[in-house]
UniProtKB/Swiss-Prot annotation:
This is Cell wall synthesis protein KNH1. Keywords: Cell wall, Cell wall biogenesis/degradation, Glycoprotein, Secreted, Signal. It comes from Saccharomyces cerevisiae (strain ATCC 204508 / S288c) (Baker's yeast). InterPro entries: Kre9/Knh1, Kre9/Knh1-like_N, Kre9/Knh1_C. O-glycosylated.
Length: 268
Protein backbone atom coordinates (compact mmCIF):
# COMPACT_ATOMS: atom_id res chain seq x y z
CA UNK A 1 0.00 0.00 0.00
CA UNK A 2 1.65 2.88 -1.21
CA UNK A 3 0.89 6.31 -2.08
CA UNK A 4 3.82 7.60 -3.92
CA UNK A 5 2.79 11.11 -4.66
CA UNK A 6 4.88 12.64 -7.24
CA UNK A 7 2.84 15.88 -7.53
CA UNK A 8 4.19 18.70 -9.65
CA UNK A 9 1.45 21.29 -10.00
CA UNK A 10 1.64 23.90 -12.74
CA UNK A 11 -1.09 26.54 -12.56
CA UNK A 12 -1.71 29.16 -15.21
CA UNK A 13 -4.31 31.92 -14.79
CA UNK A 14 -5.52 34.30 -17.51
CA UNK A 15 -4.06 37.82 -17.08
CA UNK A 16 -2.08 36.54 -14.13
CA UNK A 17 0.29 33.61 -14.38
CA UNK A 18 0.78 31.63 -11.21
CA UNK A 19 2.98 28.66 -10.52
CA UNK A 20 2.95 26.07 -7.84
CA UNK A 21 5.29 23.21 -7.06
CA UNK A 22 4.54 20.37 -4.65
CA UNK A 23 7.42 17.96 -4.16
CA UNK A 24 6.76 14.54 -2.67
CA UNK A 25 9.45 13.36 -0.26
CA UNK A 26 7.86 10.14 1.08
CA UNK A 27 7.30 7.28 0.52
CA UNK A 28 9.91 6.00 -1.91
CA UNK A 29 8.85 5.09 -5.47
CA UNK A 30 8.93 1.58 -6.96
CA UNK A 31 8.15 -0.06 -3.65
CA UNK A 32 6.61 -3.48 -3.03
CA UNK A 33 4.04 -3.88 -0.24
CA UNK A 34 3.09 -7.33 1.07
CA UNK A 35 -0.36 -7.53 2.69
CA UNK A 36 -0.26 -11.27 3.31
CA UNK A 37 -0.20 -10.90 7.08
CA UNK A 38 -2.71 -8.08 7.44
CA UNK A 39 -5.89 -6.82 5.85
CA UNK A 40 -4.66 -3.27 5.38
CA UNK A 41 -1.61 -1.09 5.61
CA UNK A 42 -1.00 2.54 6.48
CA UNK A 43 1.44 4.46 4.32
CA UNK A 44 2.59 7.92 5.30
CA UNK A 45 2.71 10.32 2.37
CA UNK A 46 4.73 13.46 2.89
CA UNK A 47 5.23 16.40 0.58
CA UNK A 48 6.49 19.96 0.68
CA UNK A 49 5.36 23.21 -0.90
CA UNK A 50 7.59 25.81 -2.50
CA UNK A 51 7.20 29.57 -2.13
CA UNK A 52 5.63 29.89 -5.57
CA UNK A 53 1.95 30.66 -6.01
CA UNK A 54 -0.65 29.30 -5.59
CA UNK A 55 0.73 28.84 -2.12
CA UNK A 56 -0.14 26.10 0.30
CA UNK A 57 -3.09 28.10 1.61
CA UNK A 58 -4.66 28.20 -1.89
CA UNK A 59 -5.40 24.47 -1.99
CA UNK A 60 -8.76 23.59 -0.48
CA UNK A 61 -9.24 19.86 -1.05
CA UNK A 62 -7.31 16.70 -1.95
CA UNK A 63 -8.76 13.44 -3.27
CA UNK A 64 -6.62 10.30 -3.44
CA UNK A 65 -7.73 7.43 -5.71
CA UNK A 66 -6.07 4.06 -6.11
CA UNK A 67 -5.67 3.18 -9.80
CA UNK A 68 -4.30 0.46 -12.04
CA UNK A 69 -3.96 -0.09 -15.77
CA UNK A 70 -1.94 1.47 -18.55
CA UNK A 71 -1.47 5.16 -19.22
CA UNK A 72 -4.08 4.99 -21.97
CA UNK A 73 -6.57 2.86 -19.98
CA UNK A 74 -6.58 4.03 -16.37
CA UNK A 75 -8.98 2.17 -14.10
CA UNK A 76 -10.00 3.45 -10.67
CA UNK A 77 -9.76 0.63 -8.14
CA UNK A 78 -10.91 2.49 -5.02
CA UNK A 79 -11.30 6.01 -3.66
CA UNK A 80 -8.94 6.20 -0.72
CA UNK A 81 -9.99 9.46 0.88
CA UNK A 82 -11.06 13.05 0.28
CA UNK A 83 -9.69 15.58 2.72
CA UNK A 84 -9.92 19.31 3.17
CA UNK A 85 -6.57 21.01 3.18
CA UNK A 86 -7.28 22.09 6.75
CA UNK A 87 -7.48 18.41 7.77
CA UNK A 88 -3.87 17.84 6.75
CA UNK A 89 -1.07 18.78 9.10
CA UNK A 90 2.64 19.06 8.35
CA UNK A 91 1.95 18.17 4.70
CA UNK A 92 1.38 14.53 5.61
CA UNK A 93 -1.34 12.04 4.77
CA UNK A 94 -1.74 8.55 6.24
CA UNK A 95 -3.28 6.45 3.49
CA UNK A 96 -5.08 3.18 4.20
CA UNK A 97 -5.38 0.59 1.43
CA UNK A 98 -7.43 -2.55 2.00
CA UNK A 99 -6.32 -5.91 0.61
CA UNK A 100 -9.81 -6.42 -0.86
CA UNK A 101 -9.62 -3.66 -3.48
CA UNK A 102 -8.03 -5.90 -6.12
CA UNK A 103 -5.65 -8.68 -7.04
CA UNK A 104 -1.88 -8.76 -6.78
CA UNK A 105 -0.42 -6.38 -9.32
CA UNK A 106 0.82 -2.93 -10.10
CA UNK A 107 -0.98 0.15 -8.81
CA UNK A 108 -0.58 3.90 -8.73
CA UNK A 109 -2.37 6.82 -7.09
CA UNK A 110 -4.31 9.62 -8.73
CA UNK A 111 -4.03 12.88 -6.80
CA UNK A 112 -6.80 15.39 -7.42
CA UNK A 113 -5.80 18.74 -5.89
CA UNK A 114 -8.44 21.45 -5.91
CA UNK A 115 -8.16 25.21 -5.54
CA UNK A 116 -10.90 27.83 -5.52
CA UNK A 117 -10.41 28.46 -9.25
CA UNK A 118 -9.64 25.04 -10.66
CA UNK A 119 -7.88 21.75 -10.12
CA UNK A 120 -4.89 19.63 -11.06
CA UNK A 121 -4.69 15.87 -11.55
CA UNK A 122 -1.40 14.06 -11.09
CA UNK A 123 -0.35 10.44 -10.82
CA UNK A 124 2.27 8.76 -8.69
CA UNK A 125 4.92 6.31 -9.76
CA UNK A 126 3.74 2.74 -9.98
CA UNK A 127 4.19 0.26 -7.13
CA UNK A 128 3.37 -3.40 -6.46
CA UNK A 129 0.86 -4.82 -3.98
CA UNK A 130 1.19 -8.46 -2.88
CA UNK A 131 -1.07 -10.58 -0.71
CA UNK A 132 -4.24 -9.04 -2.13
CA UNK A 133 -7.48 -11.06 -1.96
CA UNK A 134 -9.80 -8.93 -4.10
CA UNK A 135 -11.32 -10.05 -7.39
CA UNK A 136 -10.90 -6.86 -9.42
CA UNK A 137 -7.91 -7.49 -11.67
CA UNK A 138 -4.93 -5.16 -11.40
CA UNK A 139 -2.49 -4.64 -14.23
CA UNK A 140 0.55 -6.95 -13.81
CA UNK A 141 3.03 -4.85 -15.80
CA UNK A 142 5.30 -2.22 -14.29
CA UNK A 143 5.05 0.49 -16.96
CA UNK A 144 7.96 2.87 -16.55
CA UNK A 145 6.28 6.26 -16.86
CA UNK A 146 3.38 7.72 -14.91
CA UNK A 147 0.28 8.98 -16.76
CA UNK A 148 0.34 12.53 -18.02
CA UNK A 149 -0.80 15.20 -15.58
CA UNK A 150 -3.78 17.44 -16.28
CA UNK A 151 -4.31 21.04 -15.21
CA UNK A 152 -7.40 23.22 -15.34
CA UNK A 153 -7.34 26.65 -13.72
CA UNK A 154 -10.03 29.23 -14.45
CA UNK A 155 -10.54 32.94 -13.93
CA UNK A 156 -14.23 33.79 -13.99
CA UNK A 157 -15.75 32.03 -17.00
CA UNK A 158 -12.44 31.76 -18.88
CA UNK A 159 -10.31 28.65 -18.68
CA UNK A 160 -6.54 28.71 -18.93
CA UNK A 161 -4.70 25.73 -20.40
CA UNK A 162 -1.21 25.20 -21.78
CA UNK A 163 -0.90 25.97 -25.48
CA UNK A 164 0.69 22.93 -27.13
CA UNK A 165 2.54 25.22 -29.56
CA UNK A 166 4.66 26.43 -26.64
CA UNK A 167 6.57 23.14 -26.80
CA UNK A 168 7.71 23.85 -30.38
CA UNK A 169 9.60 27.05 -29.52
CA UNK A 170 13.36 26.33 -29.17
CA UNK A 171 14.26 26.27 -25.51
CA UNK A 172 16.98 28.90 -25.79
CA UNK A 173 14.57 31.34 -27.48
CA UNK A 174 11.96 31.22 -24.72
CA UNK A 175 11.90 34.24 -22.42
CA UNK A 176 9.05 33.58 -19.99
CA UNK A 177 9.33 32.55 -16.36
CA UNK A 178 7.98 29.14 -17.38
CA UNK A 179 9.85 27.29 -20.12
CA UNK A 180 8.59 24.40 -22.23
CA UNK A 181 10.74 21.42 -23.11
CA UNK A 182 10.12 19.08 -26.06
CA UNK A 183 8.67 15.64 -25.52
CA UNK A 184 11.19 13.02 -24.48
CA UNK A 185 11.96 10.53 -27.25
CA UNK A 186 13.39 7.04 -26.98
CA UNK A 187 16.79 6.27 -28.54
CA UNK A 188 16.88 4.49 -31.87
CA UNK A 189 17.93 0.87 -32.10
CA UNK A 190 20.98 1.76 -34.21
CA UNK A 191 23.46 4.62 -34.27
CA UNK A 192 23.70 5.92 -37.84
CA UNK A 193 25.54 9.21 -37.30
CA UNK A 194 29.14 9.35 -38.49
CA UNK A 195 30.06 12.69 -36.92
CA UNK A 196 28.77 14.85 -34.10
CA UNK A 197 28.42 18.53 -33.36
CA UNK A 198 27.34 20.65 -30.43
CA UNK A 199 23.69 21.65 -30.48
CA UNK A 200 24.53 24.81 -28.55
CA UNK A 201 28.10 25.95 -29.04
CA UNK A 202 27.98 28.42 -26.15
CA UNK A 203 25.91 29.01 -23.07
CA UNK A 204 25.38 31.87 -20.64
CA UNK A 205 26.14 32.11 -16.96
CA UNK A 206 25.54 34.97 -14.55
CA UNK A 207 27.34 35.28 -11.21
CA UNK A 208 25.62 36.97 -8.28
CA UNK A 209 27.52 38.31 -5.31
CA UNK A 210 24.43 39.31 -3.35
CA UNK A 211 21.08 37.64 -2.78
CA UNK A 212 18.62 38.32 -5.58
CA UNK A 213 14.96 38.95 -4.78
CA UNK A 214 13.50 37.67 -8.06
CA UNK A 215 14.01 34.80 -10.49
CA UNK A 216 14.17 34.55 -14.27
CA UNK A 217 12.54 31.14 -14.41
CA UNK A 218 10.13 29.34 -12.11
CA UNK A 219 9.88 25.92 -13.72
CA UNK A 220 10.11 23.86 -16.90
CA UNK A 221 7.05 22.05 -18.25
CA UNK A 222 7.59 18.85 -20.22
CA UNK A 223 4.74 17.26 -22.19
CA UNK A 224 3.72 13.70 -21.54
CA UNK A 225 4.59 10.95 -23.98
CA UNK A 226 2.36 10.44 -26.98
CA UNK A 227 3.42 6.79 -26.98
CA UNK A 228 3.42 3.98 -24.44
CA UNK A 229 6.32 1.80 -23.36
CA UNK A 230 5.33 -1.45 -21.69
CA UNK A 231 7.52 -3.50 -19.41
CA UNK A 232 7.19 -6.83 -17.72
CA UNK A 233 9.05 -9.14 -15.41
CA UNK A 234 11.73 -11.48 -16.71
CA UNK A 235 10.18 -14.91 -16.37
CA UNK A 236 13.27 -16.82 -17.55
CA UNK A 237 14.74 -19.36 -15.13
CA UNK A 238 17.80 -17.87 -13.43
CA UNK A 239 21.03 -19.11 -14.96
CA UNK A 240 23.44 -21.09 -12.78
CA UNK A 241 26.48 -19.48 -11.27
CA UNK A 242 29.49 -19.31 -13.61
CA UNK A 243 31.30 -21.89 -11.51
CA UNK A 244 28.42 -24.32 -12.10
CA UNK A 245 28.45 -24.11 -15.89
CA UNK A 246 32.18 -24.07 -16.52
CA UNK A 247 32.37 -20.34 -17.05
CA UNK A 248 34.48 -19.66 -14.00
CA UNK A 249 38.25 -19.79 -14.12
CA UNK A 250 41.05 -19.30 -11.66
CA UNK A 251 42.71 -15.93 -12.33
CA UNK A 252 46.09 -17.49 -11.60
CA UNK A 253 45.82 -19.34 -14.92
CA UNK A 254 45.98 -16.01 -16.74
CA UNK A 255 49.24 -14.95 -15.12
CA UNK A 256 52.28 -15.15 -17.40
CA UNK A 257 54.80 -13.82 -14.88
CA UNK A 258 55.57 -14.89 -11.34
CA UNK A 259 55.08 -12.28 -8.64
CA UNK A 260 58.25 -11.31 -6.82
CA UNK A 261 58.91 -9.48 -3.57
CA UNK A 262 60.63 -6.33 -4.77
CA UNK A 263 61.78 -5.21 -1.32
CA UNK A 264 63.45 -8.55 -0.70
CA UNK A 265 65.41 -8.24 -3.96
CA UNK A 266 66.64 -4.77 -3.05
CA UNK A 267 68.15 -5.95 0.25
CA UNK A 268 70.28 -8.61 -1.40
Amino acid sequence: MLIVLFLTLFCSVVFRTAYCDVAIVAPEPNSVYDLSGTSQAVVKVKWMHTDNTPQEKDFVRYTFTLCSGTNAMIEAMATLQTLSASDLTDNEFNAIIENTVGTDGVYFIQVFAQTAIGYTIHYTNRFKLKGMIGTKAANPSMITIAPEAQTRITTGDVGATIDSKSFTVPYNLQTGVVKYAPMQLQPATKVTAKTWKRKYATSEVTYYYTLRNSVDQHTTVTPGWSYIITADSNYATPAPMPADNGGWYNPRKRLSLTARKVNALRHR
